[in-house]
Amino acid sequence: MTKKERAAYIDEYLNEKYPETPIPLDHKDPYTLLVAVLLSAQCTDIRVNQITPKLFAKADNPFTMSQLSQEIIADIIRPCGLAPMKSKGIFNLSKILVKEYNGEVPKQLELLEALPGVGHKTASVVMSQAFGVPAFPVDTHIHRLAQRWGLTSGKNVQTTERDLKRLFPEERWNELHLQIIFYGREFCTARACQGLTCELCRTLYPNRKHPKKTKKS
């Protein structure tokens, strides 16, 4: 298969396998999604969904969140890991949202990326899942699968995002991002598959004999 043929096959396969793409992180509005995505760095969605009800019971909007201390926020979110850094980001971005945006989450990628603790991937998730704007958030998991499936030879998530956006129609980006995540968690895991055993890897590369190592910069 050519790269385009692999992309077309993957697109059709995942769309049939996962016709529904529920957002994994529990939230009620763009702000609570933003906070949940920030908490999900190096943490499972399951754990985040266990912690956010406790946090949002204290504060579920930037006005009340900015009235809490960083210490209180950190204590609640500690099970998510990186509590000092994440609590600082949540506290400071909440203050900025109150001061500069009247408590609203901006709908522009560049403005989201300028918020404390918000990187390109987090901003892309919010654009996609809160506002429905086409985006293709790429984390280390999607980066790994894209390499296993021969969709990119890039050594970083930035290059992989660029390559995936070129291969797939823009109207599929938001759903496909989630479908890849769902498939990776269920079948093409980091250690169990290694590019050899899941149905997609076997179909795309039937003659592959050795584990596919992820290129990293």
Language model region names:
Residues T2-K215:
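Catalytic cores of DNA base-excision repair glycosylases
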